[in-house]
Design a protein with these regions (language model features):
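Hydrophobic alpha-helical segments within soluble ligand-binding/sensing domains
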Residues: 160-187, 233-234, 280-284, 299-317
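Hinge/cleft segment of the Venus flytrap/periplasmic-binding protein
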Residues: 32-59, 303-359
Length: 359
């Protein structure tokens, strides 16, 4: 992607008009700012929308939520948003986690259990794109299916709450490109892609590379894939640091970056690489406050969970809804940590994974 293409991308993404979604009930709740996409289930075109949350449901609908895992605070915060919103609306919520992106069969069994419950709607944070899509197309069920965070095929999808992971990476790339414009001192980056999803596709990595177009970042070293397990990520980090002592930046997920903070402290390098996380967590919040991390993206995980519950209940209640939405992606630095962003992104410190809500 050349410089003109990058500029076009920014105008296309961010020079947008605002639309208002009006619901037929009054509420004192704060409106949510989202990106509403048309055509549906594509990330290329969106408009900013204001959604006023519904405040109650006409009956205790049964909602079943499936997560890839709750190994880090990203999905924990999504879980909190769902749990809190379900409690506010007086609906039932049953949740389950697959235990990692390699557990396709386990998630498929959990989906079948949702149908056997029986759920009125399924909110699916998938472990795989292609493999699960092919199975879902063969599924004989009229239960509405809503995608959450991770992408799903539009076929058979009633609604979706999520953001473009390509754009999460692109924002990292542009952040680095602005620090190192073409013609300035070259920079070297190590990129840790995290878990290898079954479709073996890294939208984040593609976004980073496109965002770095026409910059002085001359080398991007890609580390190996690895599950969001601290021991796995630590081994990958140590291996790469042993091989490359001249890094300017380390970019990865929140788990990797948290480990890197301690690893770099232990190594006492003369010029340690600076750290960037393409997504957010409680650890990233603390690290930004202390100046240990340069930048982290938040796609507002708590709001993800709230929107998913709100969207499903709207559909079941026959109320107006936007079928394909997502929170705004916000790039956070030490001087951009507002209480509202924290509230919309991170679960309370005392919150534990919750798998059942009864009205």
């Amino acid at each position: 992607m050349n410089r003109s293409a990058c500029h076009w991308w920014h105008r296309y993404r961010f020079g947008l008009v605002t639309i208002i979604l009006t619901v037929m009930m009054t509420s004192t709740a704060q409106a949510w700012t989202v990106q509403s996409r048309q055509p549906l289930f594509q990330f290329e075109q969106w408009q900013q929308a204001q959604i006023e949350p519904i405040t109650t449901a006409s009956r205790p609908w049964r909602l079943c939520a499936l997560y890839p895992h709750i190994k880090d605070s990203y999905w924990l915060s999504v879980n909190y948003g769902m749990v809190d919103q379900a409690e506010r609306l007086g609906v039932q919520l049953k949740a389950a986690e697959a235990g990692g992106y390699h557990h396709l069969e386990r998630q498929w069994q959990q989906l079948q259990a949702c149908l056997d419950w029986p759920a009125d709607a399924i909110l699916l944070g998938t472990v795989a794109y292609q493999e699960l899509n092919s199975r879902l197309q063969q599924l004989d069920s009229e239960v509405p299916l809503f995608g959450v965070v991770n992408d799903l095929s539009r076929d058979g999808l009633t609604g979706r709450v999520g953001v473009s992971w390509y754009q999460m990476g692109f924002k990292v790339g542009r952040f680095l490109a602005e620090r190192h414009p073409a013609g300035s001192v070259p920079a070297k980056v190590a990129w840790f892609p995290g878990p290898k999803r079954l479709e073996a596709k890294s939208e984040v990595g593609s976004g980073i590379r496109d965002g770095l177009a026409d910059s002085a970042v001359t080398e991007v070293i890609t580390a190996g894939y690895g599950d969001n397990d601290r021991d796995v990520q630590r081994a990958l980090l140590q291996q790469l640091l042993d091989q490359h002592q001249d890094l300017d930046y380390i970019v990865g997920g929140a788990v990797l970056v948290e480990i890197a903070i301690n690893e770099l402290k232990h190594r006492q390098l003369d010029k340690p690489p600076q750290l960037i996380s393409h997504y957010y967590s409680h650890g990233m919040y603390r690290a930004l406050l202390r100046g240990k991390v340069l930048m982290a993206n938040t796609d507002q995980m708590v709001l993800h969970g709230r929107l998913a519950i709100d969207q499903a209940v709207r559909y079941l209640e026959g109320q107006p809804l936007e079928h394909d939405i997502g929170p705004e992606i916000i790039s956070l630095t030490r001087d951009r940590l507002s209480p509202q962003i924290k509230q919309d992104s991170l679960s309370p410190a005392s919150f534990m994974p919750t798998y059942r809500v009864e009205p």
